[in-house]
Amino acid sequence: MKPKLMYQELKVPAEEPANELPMNEIEAWKAAEKKARWVLLVLILAVVGFGALMTQLFLWEYGDLHLFGPNQRPAPCYDPCEAVLVESIPEGLDFPNASTGNPSTSQAWLGLLAGAHSSLDIASFYWTLTNNDTHTQEPSAQQGEEVLRQLQTLAPKGVNVRIAVSKPNGPQPQADLQALLQSGAQVRMVDMQKLTHGVLHTKFWVVDQTHFYLGSANMDWRSLTQVKELGVVMYNCSCLARDLTKIFEAYWFLGQAGSSIPSTWPRFYDTRYNQETPMEICLNGTPALAYLASAPPPLCPSGRTPDLKALLNVVDNARSFIYVAVMNYLPTLEFSHPHRFWPAIDDGLRRAAYERGVKVRLLISCWGHSEPSMRAFLLSLAALRDNHTHSDIQVKLFVVPADEAQARIPYARVNHNKYMVTERATYIGTSNWSGNYFTETAGTSLLVTQNGRGGLRSQLEAIFLRDWDSPYSHDLDTSADSVGNACRLL
């Protein structure tokens, strides 16, 4: 039971009147305070929003490359990558004393086609895989025709086949591409003439984003049996294959009607792997560093090393030797009018020989379509070999012999290689060594640094020395009569 409580109101002493502000001044002060708070809030939101916007723009332009500090590398690739050098040796070209026996390009291509399960992306210059394309009746075209037949079987089996090809500037056979379209393949023509005043000169395949071929061989039956070619097939190397797919995706985008080169490529095309941060891979059981370069520079999204920069880096880092095998060598912009001198590579080779004492060997192709002006530039390089300066540069011309029937095959019987090897690095590309191929024309290269003997680098060195020491290599002062009419540079 609660006790009965009595409540009594407390008497609060009266306060003395204070000096109060007039009501209009109080309201003015409150309004000013409220306005100041709103201004402060707006300023804070503006700063935060600006910071968020700049961060987004930063990431959009540079992708996630800048998540890595200057001394950090992307995570290594743990795929068991296997690299195999493949060659096309023209019929009748024999190396009786050579110990190197590499798989043929056609064997490699047919093997890749047989193993394709989900996708095949091909970047190509042109397509002439059959006798009908070249108006010939050559038995040696059989290998190219078989490649085309196998390509036509893929799309009906559920393989997504995409082909990016250079848009021709004039009449060019289209029967192969039409046959592939009818089989279910997708084809896009890239108008490099409109985009950069060049062509799509790239030659690579990507299979299931796991395996790839990259090299000098075109989609041409002659590239399998009548032209000397070199390339590399990478098996079980999805890290590199996916990165090569990014280069293909850029071509695929540019193959759309009305497309243009973006001023800034979207992040989708960016790469983490380049000259500064190459991919760490296990290649043929040995640690290696690798990355893919591309040309021309406008086709290089954030992170992608331009092809010329990659090539010059190999030259500049050589300390013992530089061996180069390439079809054309011209320190000019040969397809520009008027012609321009373009000494970027030439300067690098001369500097390597003169300043660092590097042994330089150039094996340049010579055939009926060689640019005559090459001879003067090659003689200039060879003239640096001198006992007083101790510069050691040698130049030879590689001539593929042809009998009467072989000589009638159009645009055949030539060494079409495009590679370089040093004591440190391997460079396998798709471009000739003259200016326009790096400034206007689309090309791709694979760069690998690997220590030790028995790796990709030493295998490529062995191929170069086999060719250099062969009876098909000739000094610049060789009599033209000794090689017949096959060479325009003697």
Curated annotation (Swiss-Prot):
Residues 196-223, 411-437 form the PLD phosphodiesterase domain. PROSITE patterns: PLD. Keywords: Disulfide bond, Endoplasmic reticulum, Endosome, Exonuclease, Glycoprotein, Golgi apparatus, Hydrolase, Immunity, Inflammatory response, Lipid metabolism, Lysosome, Magnesium, Membrane, Metal-binding, Nuclease, Phospholipid metabolism, Repeat, Signal-anchor, Transmembrane, Transmembrane helix, Ubl conjugation. N-glycosylated. It holds the Pfam family PLDc_3. One of its GO terms (molecular function) is single-stranded DNA 5'-3' DNA exonuclease activity. It is found in: Endoplasmic reticulum membrane; Lysosome lumen; Early endosome membrane; Late endosome membrane. Its main location: endoplasmic reticulum. Phosphate binds at H201, K203, N218, H416. It is a single-pass type II membrane protein. The keyword Ubl conjugation applies. Its EC number is 3.1.16.1, 3.1.4.-. Residues 60-490 are lumenal. One of its GO terms (biological process) is immune system process. Residues 1-38 are cytoplasmic. It comes from the Eukaryota. GO terms for cellular component: early endosome membrane; endoplasmic reticulum membrane; Golgi membrane; late endosome membrane; lysosomal lumen; lysosomal membrane. Mg(2+) binds at F438. The keyword Hydrolase applies. It catalyses: Exonucleolytic cleavage in the 5'- to 3'-direction to yield nucleoside 3'-phosphates; a 5'-end 5'-dephospho-ribonucleotidyl-ribonucleotide-RNA + H2O = a ribonucleoside 3'-phosphate + a 5'-end dephospho-ribonucleoside-RNA + H(+); a ribonucleoside 3'-phosphate-2'-3'-cyclophospho-GMP + H2O = a ribonucleoside 3'-phosphate + 2',3'-cyclophospho-GMP + H(+); a 5'-end 5'-dephospho-2'-deoxyribonucleotidyl-2'-deoxyribonucleotide in single-stranded DNA + H2O = a 5'-end dephospho-2'-deoxyribonucleoside in single-stranded DNA + a 2'-deoxyribonucleoside 3'-phosphate + H(+). The catalytic domain contains two conserved PLD phosphodiesterase HxK(x4)D(E) motifs that accomodate the phosphate group of the nucleic acid substrates, with one nucleophile histidine residue forming a phosphohistidine intermediate and the other histidine protonating the leaving 5'-OH ssDNA/RNA fragment, resulting in the cleavage of the phosphodiester bond. The homodimer has two independent catalytic domains arranged at the dimer interface. 5'->3' exonuclease that hydrolyzes the phosphodiester bond of single-stranded DNA (ssDNA) and RNA molecules to form nucleoside 3'-monophosphates and 5'-end 5'-hydroxy deoxyribonucleotide/ribonucleotide fragments. Partially redundant with PLD4, can cleave all four nucleotides displaying higher efficiency for ssDNA and RNA fragments initiated with uridine and guanosine residues and lower efficiency for cytidine-initiated substrates. PANTHER family: 5'-3' EXONUCLEASE PLD3, PHOSPHOLIPASE D - RELATED. Belongs to the phospholipase D family. This is 5'-3' exonuclease PLD3. It comes from Pongo abelii (Sumatran orangutan).
